[in-house]
Amino acid sequence: MVLRSEILVNKNVMPTAEQALPGRETPMSLPEFHYVFEGTPLLGPFFEGAIDFAIFGLGCFWGAERRFWQREGVVSTVVGYAGGFTPHPTYEEVCSGLTGHTEVVLVVFDKDKVSYRELLAMFWELHNPTQGMRQGNDVGTQYRSAIYCTSPEQLEQAEASRDAFQAELSKAGFGEITTEIDQAPTVYFAEAYHQQYLAKNPQGYCGIGGTGVCLPPSLQGN
């Protein structure tokens, strides 16, 4: 078994539930409204449109969140941590590698204006999903690629899009997709400081970058 001390050194190793930090019962304090969508409650309620939710992990959540809030049809975005063990972790705890969480963006979208399939196309094309426990220069389990699905339909579409994107990646000489695709776990929202970070700090770090490979047009629409 890998020891806790080894995980602190090698952050590519997932901790077990027993090794994970205990966390806390109290969630992080969040702003009431979205910083970019002025007047829009960060977590709802959302009264207009056919609202649905998507959860994506594609590396550092600062840059990922910005790309999704820029998409027409997206009505809110929140960054957080998911897929691990520690309840309500701090950013520092996630960075330690001892929570098991990856950084994610919760995307709230109007299905009448943008489809889940279109968001999946964005997800695949915005990052390199073949890198395992890293994304570019960002290394560790918190940067692993993930799609967490809120319905059986989302799970089916996510797996189909993965298979189609793998075919395109293979043609371009890339390796196997390592993206974790699963039913949605609990998303623990990140500290207020991280919410819409690049809107507050336009010159801030953004490590997001794709492979240049695209999904076939037939899989990018409704």
Swiss-Prot record:
This protein's record includes keyword Methyltransferase: no
Point out the signal peptide segment. Answer: none
One Gene Ontology cellular component: cytoplasm
Q: Keyword RNA-binding on this protein?
A: no
Gene3D superfamilies, from UniProt? Answer: Peptide methionine sulphoxide reductase MsrA
What GO biological process terms are annotated to this protein in UniProt?
cellular response to oxidative stress; protein modification process
User: What name has this protein been given in UniProt?
Assistant: Peptide methionine sulfoxide reductase MsrA
This chain's source organism reads: Pseudomonas putida (strain GB-1)
Q: What is the lineage of its organism?
A: Bacteria, Pseudomonadati, Pseudomonadota, Gammaproteobacteria, Pseudomonadales
